[in-house]
Design a protein with these regions (language model features):
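Gly-rich Lys/Arg/Thr-decorated short loops/hinges at beta-loop-alpha junctions or inter-strand turns
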Residues: 19-27, 223-235, 316
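Active-site-facing alpha/beta catalytic cores
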Residues: 2-7, 86-241, 245-246, 268-269, ...
Length: 349
């Protein structure tokens, strides 16, 4: 009798190029390096009260079509140039989707959206798209879901997020402590702050853990700790973007002796999954800024070329989300201008 005990539930295995292979195949030039380095520094300056602008991470819930993503980026790059005096715009470029149960997990996992799971194609598409976006002079931000995929793209990422479902994970806290960009950590799906604040404290410190290098070797990695970590309020059972919630969050951050910068996600629990409700969230944030709030440093908006969302099918509408519903382009411009005006008027007071 064969008593097999190893990998008994692995039913398929396909080799994926090592990160260094794609990094060498699609290298970044000095202009892109300068953009990423500079944007990371600008976000850090905002987080540490040395730059009075607001940074705004805005874009599709998830990337499923690189053509529409690039068209969106072209439009957003123009807004970034127009409004850069008051707000620093970073495109939301999410390639991986955490799922509560099951579902499409994103461009890297299943780029053809047909359950063929061509991850080798997915990581290549992701890197190429990020380079194309950066060539427009537009920085990119993403969510980090695992410790392997960042090795393919982090040199082109200016800001990153640890999501509500992974904020309590030791692996993700260790990852955040070693990532080269500022990192936002979301409050839990129930709206609680503890997981995010504990995550910030952990990510601030050095960690030693097993990880993979760009050469795909397993190695002991020691991190320096990341002082550019901050909380993201994404709501929960109830929204938490209002003044009372922001003030109670500030109190909790002070008591924990971590960075007091707050980013507000206008979508998810704060919009109660209704994409049009992002607009009143942005209005509230703008009012709080106008009334002197110095701790709201960042905003996140889910937006696409066309509003709403659609179910996955063989004939997808161009420029519309296949995951969470997003606001359309016209509303996006209105919200960006509203936030920019709030910063501008606050300076004039």
């Amino acid at each position: 009798m064969n008593y097999s005990t190893d990998n008994t539930r692995i039913i398929d295995r396909r080799k994926v190029p090592a990160p260094y292979e794609l990094v060498n195949k699609y290298p970044i030039n000095d202009e892109i390096s300068k953009l990423v380095y500079g944007t990371r520094n600008e976000i850090s300056q905002i987080l540490h009260n040395k730059d009075d602008r607001l940074f705004v991470v805005v874009g599709p819930c998830s990337i499923h079509d690189t053509e529409s993503a690039l068209e969106y980026a072209e439009k957003l790059a123009l807004q970034n140039k127009k409004l850069n005096k008051n707000i620093l715009i970073i495109m939301r470029v999410y390639f991986e989707k955490p799922r509560t149960t099951v579902g499409w997990k994103g461009l890297i996992n299943d780029p053809d959206i047909n359950e063929t799971f061509n991850i080798a194609k997915g990581v290549e598409l992701a890197r190429k798209l990020l380079i194309n976006i950066a060539e427009l002079g537009l920085p990119a931000g993403t969510e980090f879901l695992d410790p392997i995929s960042p090795q393919y793209v982090t040199d082109i990422i200016s800001w990153g997020a640890i999501g509500a479902r992974t904020a309590e994970s030791q692996i993700h806290r260790e990852l955040a402590s070693g990532l080269s960009c500022p990192i936002g950590i979301k409050n839990g799906t129930d709206g609680g702050l503890k997981a995010a604040i504990d995550g910030i404290q952990a990510a601030n410190h050095s960690h030693v853990f097993l990880g993979a290098t760009k050469e795909a070797d397993i190695a002991m990695l020691k991190t320096a700790g990341n002082n550019d970590t901050h909380i993201i309020l994404r709501g929960g059972k109830e929204p938490n973007y209002d003044l009372e919630s922001v003030n109670s969050t500030l109190t909790a951050l002070r008591e924990a002796e971590v960075n007091e910068s707050i980013m507000i996600d206008a979508s998810h629990g704060n919009s109660q999954k209704k994409f049009k409700q992002q607009i009143p969230v942005i209005e509230s944030i703008s009012d709080q800024i106008l009334n002197g709030n110095d701790n709201i440093k960042g905003v996140m908006i889910e937006s696409h070329l066309n509003e709403g969302n659609q179910k996955i099918s063989e004939s997808l509408k161009y420029g519309q989300s296949i995951t969470d519903a997003c606001m359309g382009w016209e509303d996006t411009v209105m919200c960006l201008e509203m936030l920019s005006d709030a910063i501008d008027k606050k300076r004039g007071k």
